[in-house]
């Protein structure tokens, strides 16, 4: 990054020149020649006093301009010299600077959000599913890849794992799987740190996600002024969507080090990943090894003043900043292709340079719009999704759709989720009558046979709202569409299991706020910061081991003797122990059978005495049952609330248990109760029918919501304790961690597979569940009534008279054992005969 232009220190008023009631859609950038950093207010701000954009250009207005434009284009093409061969500049001689660059900011593995309700995408669920299928008979198939016909990839929507029909062969999950390119961080001569390709990178490859703190516009403006006051020379703001920005100035990923170029090899793209909108740096062409990774800052990145550009490209405009979204020189290639003006822009040299100013869309360059052709459908659909913050671009794209009469193009647009795109247009830009009118006129030409797409896209909702509009033309078109759609029939399709329904829960669990990240900060650096350089370590000399004394080889064993009936005194100690164990078990079996027979013989005369001996226990149980039978309604309601409280408390304690070592035990119990009480109140308010259920339970979805709420609640507690200095350091090792050298653990495992095992050691998970249950009882108390209710539901408790004492089942007798011992074999073999 270059040095900023010298001038007076900017203030917040200087950064946002204009009326107080103005709310800019994009952050301002000072023009390069303004020493006072004053932003020249233009029509890029909605609600400005400047005249509104011109209405759509009619055919009569385009006639003279069309002729002049075509003639001038032909002249320019005839004068245009043959292009020189492009040779990228390599920076493979620069040293890597991973560690030095890491000291300048705090690394994040993924974006963190000021609130969880920002950074959300506006797409319908219907747009999340593509049509790609993996063909196992085609080894060269690339489902959902860059060269495929994947709808999701064309619209910058990432496929959902488990939902895409290509399965594990899907190539459109770069963000979720963190499939980043192989790059290095280097220190440049004039531009600060930069990124360099460590290997050849193909076109349309994700270099790195642009990671940072996602903040709202109010926070963005405050940070702009704060960074200026702190003397920070380079800002790293990127506009995610309307009134939402990614700030990678102090926290982010290595994508922040990608430098600017007026002829970049990469571009910034906004992708829908699950429920979130995320930004990534993608290659526009093949990038060779040693080439610097660059993209154009003039539209995608924002700062408070312009800076000198050091890209060194032939078409360098000289400065970074001061450009608008309608500047042809910085316009994304996607929009040029979608407007169908790429060839015209290149032929007339409209992108500008240091000596020539670039053209402005609809100001000094009015494009000649034509109907959409087949190869442009995907570009137009993708450009519409990317133009929700650019009304002027959206108007031009909708004009192309409106003037297209080819039914085949209409079907292709509907296949590219055209109705869902129009739903976004009518909901996000409903205040612009020109755009709304163009959208309605376009959809009025789309012919359907069934209304499934209408239902899936939910387009009927905004159209019904427009049917009540005060504009007669908009109202008439909306009613006409609703009437036409009502004549269509809905086709039934067999529904398949979808994972889209779980996206909300996954997003809630996987999204972290800035406050949570500040409390639970990762101590280690992400994998991208691992130092791959060779490190030499001096190891202390180790005393050589003494060689074992060579011993003579034993003589060969004698020939085997004939098998004889084993004598008891010739058996080894292991054989004797095994035989003793078998004999003891057989004796136990005989004794158990004899005891069972004796009990059966004496059951009748002793029945009365056994009942009289257990009379106190029976009286106590009968007293508890009578007490519950005569409970008042208030007592029953209190009992059910206590059960619900303990049921929710068990999930809360389990979720908070990982932070138990960071606070005192009494403090942990206090906040666990408070969190549980809050959730119980919410559950009682939302689901009053819990009182009708005798044994309440929680669904998996509700447990997930409780865990998410508990996680946020615990993070706030930890932050509060940290501010008061009461936060304890977590223990270095868990008390439940198993020591592999523990002799007790070794003793619990059997040394011989043939020896019967008498007892087993409970697993670590069982111990943890037992301890969690004890902790829940310690916090909320044991519920004896619940245990008694469960006992009543069993068949034994349904009778008024208790059952006689049960006798343990007799152990089945063991089959006779015949042991054969061979003298020349060290381990005897036991043969079980039935």
Curated annotation (Swiss-Prot):
Function: Histone methyltransferase that trimethylates histone H3 'Lys-36' forming H3K36me3. Involved in transcription elongation as well as in transcription repression.
Domain called Post-SET: residue spans: 305-321
Key words of the record: Chromosome, Methyltransferase, Nucleus, Repressor, S-adenosyl-L-methionine, Transcription, Transcription regulation, Transferase
Biased composition (Polar residues): 604-613, 730-766
Lineage, top ranks: Eukaryota, Fungi, Dikarya, Basidiomycota, Agaricomycotina
Domain notes per entry: The AWS and SET domains are necessary for transcription repression.
Composition-biased stretches (Basic residues): 720-729
Top-level taxon of the source organism: Eukaryota
InterPro entries in alphabetical order: AWS_dom, Post-SET_dom, Set2_fungi, SET2_Histone-Lys_MeTrsfase, SET_dom, SET_dom_sf, SETD2/Set2_SET, SRI
Entry-linked Pfam families: AWS, Med26, SET, SRI
Pro residues composition bias: residue spans: 25-34, 551-563, 802-816
Disordered, as annotated region: 1-83, 531-568, 601-638, 680-703, 720-818
Record domain AWS: where: 125-179
Family note: Belongs to the class V-like SAM-binding methyltransferase superfamily. Histone-lysine methyltransferase family. SET2 subfamily.
UniProt keyword Methyltransferase, yes or no: yes
This protein's record includes keyword Transferase: yes
GO terms under cellular component: chromatin; nucleus
Originating organism: Cryptococcus neoformans var. neoformans serotype D (strain JEC21 / ATCC MYA-565) (Filobasidiella neoformans)
Protein name, entry field: Histone-lysine N-methyltransferase, H3 lysine-36 specific
Bias type Low complexity, positions: 541-550
CDD domains found in the cross-reference section: SET_SETD2
Gene: SET2
One GO molecular-function entry: histone H3K36 methyltransferase activity
């Amino acid at each position: 990054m270059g040095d900023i232009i010298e001038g007076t220190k900017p203030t917040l008023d200087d950064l946002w020149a204009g009326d107080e009631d103005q709310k800019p859609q994009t952050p301002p950038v000072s023009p390069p020649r303004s020493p006072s950093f004053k932003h020249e207010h233009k029509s890029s701000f909605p609600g400005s006093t400047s005249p509104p954009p011109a209405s759509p250009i009619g055919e009569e207005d385009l006639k003279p301009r069309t002729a002049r434009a075509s003639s001038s284009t032909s002249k320019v093409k005839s004068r245009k010299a043959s292009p020189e061969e492009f040779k990228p500049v390599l920076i493979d001689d620069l040293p890597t600077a991973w560690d030095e660059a890491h000291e300048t900011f705090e690394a994040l593995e993924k974006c963190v959000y000021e609130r969880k309700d920002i950074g959300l995408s506006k797409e319908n669920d219907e747009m999340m599913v593509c049509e790609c299928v993996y063909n196992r008979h085609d080894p060269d198939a690339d489902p959902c890849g860059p060269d495929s016909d994947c709808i999701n990839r064309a619209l910058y929507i990432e496929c959902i794992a488990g939902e895409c029909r290509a399965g594990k062969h899907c190539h459109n999950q770069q963000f979720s799987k963190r499939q980043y390119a192989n790059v290095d961080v280097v220190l440049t001569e004039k531009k600060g740190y930069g990124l360099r390709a460590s290997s050849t990178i193909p076109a349309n490859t994700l270099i790195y996600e642009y990671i940072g703190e996602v903040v709202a516009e109010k926070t963005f403006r405050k940070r702009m002024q704060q960074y200026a006051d702190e003397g920070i020379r380079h800002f790293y703001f990127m506009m995610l969507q309307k009134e939402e920005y990614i700030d990678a100035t102090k926290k982010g990923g290595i994508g922040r080090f990608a430098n600017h170029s007026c002829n970049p090899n990469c571009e910034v793209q906004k992708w829908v990943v699950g429920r979130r909108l995320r930004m990534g740096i993608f290659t526009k062409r093949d990038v060779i090894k040693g080439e610097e990774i660059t993209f154009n800052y003039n539209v995608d990145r924002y700062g408070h003043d312009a800076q000198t550009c050091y890209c060194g490209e032939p078409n360098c405009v000289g400065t970074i900043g001061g450009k608008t979204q309608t500047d042809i020189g910085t316009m994304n290639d996607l929009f040029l292709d979608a407007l169908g003006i790429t060839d015209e822009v290149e032929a007339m040299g409209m992108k500008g340079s240091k000596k020539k100013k670039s053209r402005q869309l609809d100001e000094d360059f009015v494009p000649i719009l034509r109907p959409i052709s087949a190869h442009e459908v995907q570009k137009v659909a993708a450009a519409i999704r990317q133009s929700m913050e650019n009304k002027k671009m959206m108007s031009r794209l909708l004009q192309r759709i409106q003037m297209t009469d080819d039914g085949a193009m209409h079907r292709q647009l509907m296949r590219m989720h055209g109705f869902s795109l129009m739903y976004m247009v009518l909901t996000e830009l409903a205040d612009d009558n020109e755009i709304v009118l163009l959208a309605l006129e376009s959809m009025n030409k789309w012919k359907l046979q069934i209304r499934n797409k209408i239902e899936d896209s939910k387009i009927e909702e905004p159209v019904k709202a427009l049917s009540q509009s005060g504009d007669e033309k908009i109202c008439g078109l909306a009613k006409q569409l609703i009437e036409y759609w009502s004549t269509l029939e809905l086709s039934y399709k067999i529904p398949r299991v979808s994972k889209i329904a779980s996206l909300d829960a996954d997003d809630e669990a996987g999204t972290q706020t800035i406050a949570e990240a500040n409390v639970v900060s990762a101590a280690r650096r992400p994998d991208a910061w691992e130092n791959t350089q060779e490190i030499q370590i001096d190891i202390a000399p180790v005393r050589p081991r003494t060689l074992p004394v060579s011993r003579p080889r034993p003589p060969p064993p004698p020939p085997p003797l004939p098998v004889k009936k084993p004598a008891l005194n010739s058996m080894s100690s292991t054989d004797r122990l095994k035989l003793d164990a078998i004999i003891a078990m057989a004796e136990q079996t005989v004794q158990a059978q004899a005891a069972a027979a004796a009990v059966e013989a004496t059951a009748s005369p002793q029945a009365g005495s056994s009942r009289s001996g257990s009379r106190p226990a029976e009286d106590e149980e009968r007293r508890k049952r009578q007490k519950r039978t005569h409970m008042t309604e208030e007592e029953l309601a209190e009992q059910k609330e206590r059960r619900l409280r303990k049921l929710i408390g068990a999930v809360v304690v389990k979720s908070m248990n990982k932070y138990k070592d960071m606070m005192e035990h009494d403090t942990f119990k206090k906040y666990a109760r408070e969190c549980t009480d809050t959730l119980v109140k919410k559950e009682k308010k939302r689901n009053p029918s819990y009182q009708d259920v005798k044994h309440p339970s929680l669904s998996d979805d509700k447990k997930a919501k409780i865990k998410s709420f508990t996680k946020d609640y615990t993070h706030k507690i930890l932050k509060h304790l940290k501010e008061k200095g009461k936060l304890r350091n977590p223990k270095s090792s868990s008390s439940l961690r198993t020591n592999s050298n523990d002799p007790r653990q070794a003793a619990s495992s059997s040394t011989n597979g043939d020896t019967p095992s008498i007892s087993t050691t409970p697993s670590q998970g069982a111990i943890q569940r037992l301890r969690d249950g004890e902790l829940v009882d310690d916090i909320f108390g044991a519920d004896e009534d619940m245990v008694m209710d469960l006992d009543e539901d069993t068949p034994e408790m349904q009778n008024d008279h208790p059952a006689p004492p049960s006798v343990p089942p007799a152990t089945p007798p063991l089959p006779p054992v015949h042991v054969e011992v061979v003298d020349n074999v060290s381990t005897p073999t036991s043969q079980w005969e039935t």
